[in-house]
Amino acid sequence: MANWNRFLPKDFEYDFDQDKLSAHRVSFEEAVECFFSDFEIRRNKAYKDRYQLIGKTIGGRKLKIIFQLKPDNVVRIITGWDI
């Protein structure tokens, strides 16, 4: 389990071919910004290998981001939306 208080992502991955973020009018850049704000992380109940991050973009937009944590702190963003 990651220590979320000291978590610093090494890199980000995203499937631009499926682009589930755009369906919610969220850009990949906005999703990444949320990882560098004050954030809260919970386990995703539906998928045990995924997490939910609630954070803010530089512009102040509050988003929920669904992601997987891969080896070496690589974050695979699945989707996200406004909350």
PLM segments and residue spans:
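Ribonuclease/tRNase effector modules and their secretory precursors
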Residues: M1-I83
